[in-house]
Regions:
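Phosphate/diphosphate ligand-binding glycine-rich loop within oxidoreductases
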Residues: 2-102
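Glycine-rich adenosine-cofactor-binding loop
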Residues: 8, 94-99, 104-129
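Structural motif
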Residues: 52, 109, 149-151, 168
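Short glycine-rich anion-binding loops that position phosphate/pyrophosphate groups of nucleotides
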Residues: 55-62, 118, 154-158, 174-177
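ADP-ribose/adenylate-binding Rossmann-like module
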Residues: 76, 82, 163-195
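Active-site capping/gating segments
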Residues: 102, 187-220
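NAD(P)-binding Rossmann-fold cofactor-contacting core
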Residues: 113, 127-144
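Rossmann-like NAD(P)-binding element
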Residues: 143-163, 170, 174
Length: 220
């Protein structure tokens, strides 16, 4: 029986299995491939009955290196959050990009905090809508920073976040959010929204079948 899964670390508390089960009413198994060893993960992906897997930190950039076919979205982001096995090859895709384009909307300026796989997708999304983003890493927040839209992809709180001023802040981290109570933001989009959007956009790439969107939106 074909199966699907999520690769990354740490992922024991991931909500992805719940979303996938809701999307397809539990018709396919969805396993957690939790490991710090990417080669071991890919070996399982190639040799077991996986049709496709979601990919999260710290493997989004590494995923491109094992792929035979790289979608335009993944190429533009320099990272993939979906790997699909098809005709003996591995395809890399990125559903974060379109999800971010939707969430960012019509922005006058974009600040991206964090340069990992999610940060790279945010940079590409900003450029897609015609805005050259500013990138700051976790140790570059000492001075007050202002932007129309901020995308924070940090896994944990970093000193200086409290000084951000923006119309809209989009946070990737849904497990332990660190931006939801910042005083200088007018609108906050939580990581669960990001998670659900990229899932809805990516599941059909993984399975070949449309997900139950209403069920995904109501799952968490």
């Amino acid at each position: 029986m074909i199966k699907f899964g999520l690769a990354g670390y740490p992922i024991a508390d991931s909500l992805s299995p719940r979303l996938f089960d809701a999307a397809y009413h539990g018709n396919w198994p969805y396993e957690l491939l939790e490991s710090t060893d990417f080669e071991a993960v890919i070996k399982r992906f190639r040799t077991e009955d996986f049709k496709a897997i979601n990919v999260t930190a710290p493997f989004k950039t590494l995923a491109l290196g094992v792929s035979d076919v790289i979608s335009e979205e993944a190429r533009r982001c320099g990272a993939a959050n979906i790997l699909v096995r098809k005709d003996g090859r591995i395809e890399a895709h990125n559903s974060d990009l379109m999800a971010l384009i939707v969430m960012i909307g019509l922005a006058k300026s974009v600040l991206v905090i964090g340069g990992g796989g999610a940060g790279k997708a945010a940079i590409s999304a900003a450029r897609t809508i015609g805005v050259e983003p500013v990138l700051r890493h976790h140790d570059e927040l000492a001075e007050p920073l202002e932007a129309d839209v901020v995308v924070c992809t940090l896994p944990r709180y970093a000193p200086g976040l409290e000084h951000i001023r923006c119309r809209k802040l989009i946070e990737a981290n849904y497990k332990t959010p660190c931006c939801d109570a910042l005083p200088g933001i007018k609108e906050y989009i939580p990581g669960t929204t990001w998670l659900k959007l990229q899932a809805i956009l990516g599941y059909e790439l993984m399975t070949g079948e449309k997900p139950d969107v209403k069920a995904v939106l109501g799952a968490i």
